[in-house]
A protein has these predicted regions:
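Beta-strand-dominated extracellular/periplasmic modules and repeats
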Residues: 1-234
Length: 234
C-alpha cells in the first residue's frame, strides 16, 4: 500500500553544496573523496541524550541573563520544529548563538573592533513543547565584516542548532531577517542554489507575537527533512 507519509528526499539545489567557491573556506573544507557511510549501532541511536532538567526558563531569554539590560532592538523569535509532513517535533533541544547589536560575538577569536556588551552573552537554549513550538527573547544582531572577499559583510543572522533524540542527531542552520540588503551579496546564504529554498532561511515578521512597547516578533519554522526541508549547514 502507498504510504503518503514516507520520507520524501529533498530536491537538488535546495541544500547548500559542500563546495561553493564563493564561500572561500569551503574550498578547503569540502570533501575530496566519496563520503563513507558509517553504520549506526544501538549505542549511537539510543544516546547520549541531553538532560531536560538542565534547560531552564532563563535560558531562552537572552535579555535577562545578566544584571542589566543589553543594548539593541529587542526581538522575539518563535516558531515550530516540524517533520516532513508538518507534524511538530516535541522535546527537541534548540540552541541559538549570535552577535550582539554591534555585530560582535563574545568569543576570543572575534577580533572585530565593535564593542562587547557586558549584559549580552549571545547564546540560549530551549526544549520544544508537545507541538514542536519554541520561543526566544533576544536582541537583533548586527552585521559584521568577515574577510571572505573585498568589503565582505555578513547579514544579520542567528545560528540555530537542533538535537533529536540523541546528541549525535544534530542539525545546524542560520536564520536571516526580512529586507536585509546584504543577503544579495552573502555567499553563505547564496550557497543554496534554489531561491524558494533560500527564502526558507528568512524569518517572517510576526504581528501576533510582537509585544506592545517591548519587542518585535519574528517567526521561523524549521523543517527537518523532506521536500520542504530548511537548508542545513554541511
Amino acid at each position: 500500500m502507498h504510504d503518503p507519509r514516507r520520507y520524501r528526499k529533498f530536491a537538488a539545489g535546495t541544500q547548500p553544496e559542500y563546495l561553493h567557491p564563493a564561500y572561500v573556506s569551503s574550498v578547503k573544507r569540502a570533501p575530496t573523496e566519496p563520503l563513507i557511510l558509517l553504520p549506526h549501532t544501538k549505542t549511537e541511536t539510543s544516546g547520549p541524550v541531553f538532560g531536560h532538567s538542565l534547560v531552564t526558563a532563563a535560558d531562552s531569554d537572552l535579555t535577562a541573563q545578566h544584571s542589566g539590560e543589553p543594548l539593541g532592538e529587542r526581538i522575539i523569535v518563535s516558531g515550530r520544529v516540524l517533520d516532513e509532513d508538518g507534524r511538530g517535533v516535541p522535546e527537541s533541544l534548540v540552541e541559538i548563538w549570535q552577535a550582539n547589536a554591534a555585530g560582535r560575538y563574545l568569543h576570543k577569536m572575534d577580533h572585530h573592533g565593535a564593542p562587547l556588551d557586558p549584559n549580552f552573552s549571545g547564546c540560549g537554549r530551549v526544549m520544544t513543547d508537545t507541538e514542536g513550538r519554541y520561543r526566544f527573547v533576544s536582541i537583533k544582531p548586527g552585521a559584521y565584516p568577515w574577510g571572505n572577499h573585498h568589503n565582505a559583510w555578513r547579514p544579520q543572522h542567528i545560528h540555530f542548532s537542533l538535537f533529536g533524540a540523541g546528541l549525535l542527531t544534530r542539525l545546524v542552520t542560520q536564520m536571516y531577517f526580512p529586507g536585509d540588503p546584504l543577503l544579495e551579496f552573502d555567499p553563505i546564504y547564496n550557497s543554496t542554489a534554489d531561491e524558494p529554498a533560500r527564502r526558507r532561511l528568512v524569518a517572517k515578521f510576526d504581528w501576533e507575537t510582537t509585544e506592545p512597547s517591548h519587542a518585535l516578533g519574528y517567526r521561523f519554522d524549521i523543517v527537518l527533512r523532506g521536500r520542504e526541508q530548511t537548508p542545513m549547514e554541511k
